[in-house]
Amino acid sequence: MEIKIVTNNDKEFVMSIDKHINDTGYNNLVYTKSGYVIWEKNQRTGIIVHCILWDNIPFMNFLFIKEEYRNKGLAKQAIIIWENEMKNQGYKMTLISTQVDEGAQHLYRKLGYIDCGGLVFNNTPFDQPMEIFFRKVL
């Protein structure tokens, strides 16, 4: 398993998964190298998207594994590789988030992430269950 920085060749795959992104956003992923495709046996199996908060904290704001590749440890491996990449770039801590009704929070805690807050977007254009944030010192 490996993760590779998103290129223009990955656009159809990434945009079929991430419904939050438009053409401008995708071009930004490529330009800033803030997106990764997760590969297993020469197949695209998922994506990771991150941004850098306050110029010094990588925040993984999207992780998705295709249904047929779930429960095989790919998300765990991808997160560990991503963390190592962020550490190699000199970052000291990472953030991850997920909705309170999603199971990913259990994986994040198993990987050493600590709950550090949440956001509620009730009665806004972004209405959703609470978003829980996790931090990890690298």
Task: Describe these PLM feature segments.
Residues 1-9, 136-138:
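Conserved N-terminal entry element of GNAT/NAT acetyltransferase domains
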Residues 5-62, 66, 79, 121:
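Acetyl-CoA-dependent GNAT
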Residues 39-41, 135-138:
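Active-site beta-strand termini and strand-to-loop segments that position acidic
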Residues 60, 82-86, 104:
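Short hydrophobic clusters on alpha-helical segments that form packing/core surfaces
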Residues 65, 71-84, 110:
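Conserved acetyl-CoA-binding loop-helix of GNAT-fold acetyltransferases
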Residues 75, 79, 101-104, 121-127:
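Short glycine/proline-centered loop/turn elements that form peptide/ligand docking sites
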Residues 86-98:
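Conserved GNAT acetyl-CoA-binding A-motif
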Residues 95-97, 114-131:
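Conserved catalytic-core motifs of GNAT/GCN5-like acyltransferases
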